């Protein structure tokens, strides 16, 4: 179960919000009193998410869009929802190609979603923090793949390593204005997609053999890390990359 946090009257933008980790972050924030702005491409899933929160103080506000859109489009989609007090850059894609099979299209798409989008959205939100003197928090959802290499994941690993450096650079630039920026770096997470992708026993064993804690992460374990970093409980934490990986990155 997610830990108890109070985000009453806070407005939090979450990308990649229509399924998996992003959806559960939205629901947990809404239950903790936040006004959640849920950004994703899948309109049907977003509307379903809104229905799940109709009994709460705030319903979730959906934004249908793609984080890889250009800066002008992102501005038009996001800025009307200011002020925002927190951002979770959760949207991301994974590519699985061995060297010799990687395409330029795969590289461009992966970096557009996993790096360029988070930078542009963080920049918009940070301007909102500064203009309104908000002590805001940004959490980027990265991966254990930013810290340790994974076979056949060169493009994905490179994109998440780049995102971790974005976290550190933003933390360095924005800290003097009381804006915190951190990353959460999970292992495989037991979403529906995670269960499907890691159902093969041999594939699963190969990964678990590298982990001191011999299991994959539950969604709540990632959500708890995100809510902690968004909250005032983490008021002295910035520039961190927080592994939720059962010790994978320690080996």
Swiss-Prot record:
It catalyses: xylitol + NADP(+) = L-xylulose + NADPH + H(+). Strongly inhibited by 10% dimethyl sulfoxide. Expressed in intestine, gonad and spermatids (at protein level). Expressed in intestine, uterine seam, gonadal sheath cells, spermathecal-uterus valve and spermatids. GO terms for biological process: D-xylose metabolic process; glucose metabolic process; xylulose catabolic process; xylulose metabolic process. Keywords: Carbohydrate metabolism, Cell membrane, Membrane, NADP, Oxidoreductase, Xylose metabolism. It is an enzyme of class 1 (oxidoreductase). Its main location: membrane. Homotetramer. This is L-xylulose reductase. The lineage of its organism: Eukaryota, Metazoa, Ecdysozoa, Nematoda, Chromadorea.
